[in-house]
Amino acid sequence: MVAVLQSTLPIIFSMEFIMGTLGNGFIFLIVCIDWVQRRKISLVDQIRTALAISRIALIWLIFLDWWVSVHYPALHETGKMLSTYLISWTVINHCNFWLTANLSILYFLKIANFSNIIFLYLKFRSKNVVLVTLLVSLFFLFLNTVIIKIFSDVCFDSVQRNVSQIFIMYNHEQICKFLSFTNPMFTFIPFVMSTVMFSLLIFSLWRHLKNMQHTAKGCRDISTTVHIRALQTIIVSVVLYTIFFLSFFVKVWSFVSPERYLIFLFVWALGNAVFSAHPFVMILVNRRLRLASLSLIFWLWYRFKNIEV
């Protein structure tokens, strides 16, 4: 079991690194090309671009941390290195969750059909809603960063006073357990927001289909198609981030033996697969990104075919 996990982990981390960089990089490239051609960029594309950049940064950070831990374990164990990684990971992960939540909010405001006066007020001020949400998230980011900084400094100061290997491992275990509590606590709010937006979109689609029965029974109109595509994007986000949250709770259980530590790394890799898998869902759901990806595939196929000939 241990040997299998040891041989599997490098493959998983490498695949996540390659696929995540390619998927998010492709979204960033297509949005930028479209921005240059049209001389303007929509709010949805702005969030997609920021989300792609933050995910690329997070994937590279995770991969570099794993690479340093394998090739330079002494450097990886230093307090300054770990503290820098923890804060960097917290900031970038925070951006990922809140940008995803804002994308869900934007889908809901643009697509859903409600006659409620509050909804209509927010619908025509969707940009302000996104900006206010991001500003509010900065408070949680500041609070989370300060808590992690204080806790990590206390632990690393203790390590400097007691440099025994057992004590160092104990401190690292306590830090990981602490993060497994604080990070889900601070990222649970955007997760709930995405889940609520998903539920409201389902309700909006149900009402729309009910109204359609009186006009064009059995016919799928544009609004229905848009609802379904938005729901596909959000539900995948909710499912993937649920896996991400579950991975944190498994980490608390895993710090008992070396075998369980490998399980911790394996679950950690699966949890971070969220940032590599979700961009491909966004590409498949979005018509413009899907057509661009098909064009790229056909172009590559044509180039390789000519090379072989």
UniProtKB/Swiss-Prot annotation:
The record lists the membrane-crossing segments as 11-31, 56-76, 81-101, 128-148, 186-206, 230-250, 263-283
Compartment annotation: Membrane
> Can you tell me which residues are glycosylated?
162
Q: What's its membrane topology?
A: Multi-pass membrane protein
Keywords in alphabetical order, please. Answer: G-protein coupled receptor, Glycoprotein, Membrane, Receptor, Sensory transduction, Taste, Transducer, Transmembrane, Transmembrane helix
Q: Which GO terms describe its cellular component?
A: membrane
Under the heading Pfam families, the entry gives: TAS2R
InterPro entries of this UniProt entry? TAS2R (IPR007960)
Which regions face the Cytoplasmic side of the membrane?
32-55, 102-127, 207-229, 284-309
One GO MF annotation is: bitter taste receptor activity
Mapped to this chain, the residue ranges on the Extracellular side of the membrane are 1-10, 77-80, 149-185, 251-262
Misc. remarks from the entry: Several bitter taste receptors are expressed in a single taste receptor cell.
Role = Putative taste receptor which may play a role in the perception of bitterness.
Q: What PANTHER family does the annotation carry? A: TASTE RECEPTOR TYPE 2, TASTE RECEPTOR TYPE 2 MEMBER 113
The record's similarity note reads: Belongs to the G-protein coupled receptor T2R family.
Name used for this protein in its record: Taste receptor type 2 member 113
Name the source organism: Mus musculus
